[in-house]
Amino acid sequence: MTDDNYLKRKHMKTSRGIRNNNPLNIRRSADNWQGAREEQTDQSFVQFKSMAYGYRAAWKVLQTYYDRFCMQGKPFTVRNIISRWAPPDENDTEAYIRRVLKLSSIGGKENLLPPDNVDGYERLSGLLQAMTCIECGISPQEVDTEAICRGYRLAFPENNEELDKWLQAKDEYWNW
């Protein structure tokens, strides 16, 4: 027999980003996100059908940032990404940057590869994992890294074969 009160308490403690399948808490806008729930009951944040679609949106946001930064002559770094994502008028941007750098092990001035480049997958998936920890208030072990990968596949389906090869090579390296 299930304790309904326990389930209600557990659900109430779950972060908004997890409940919405929106791990980076992407705000509602005029964008018509692939995988968005038909009925949007949260007035502020997009609600997705699955966590994979939430991460698909996150990958697409990163790609948009990359494209904009290139057009503006800015490097694609954690500092520039987070400064755009969590501007100082609404956030403690410097604390957010420090936390992401610590959780992701990405260098502060490291110029990252574009999101649609499989060679940059490991670094950027680490970035998304760190941002999820901050946005959802969870530990790195609680982040659904499989959903990050599925989101990448949904965002960049043309790279699925190359990603499979990369993942297989990484798996073989760690399991020799």
Name each model-derived stretch.
Residues 1-176:
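Cell-wall polysaccharide-cleaving catalytic domain and substrate-binding groove, primarily
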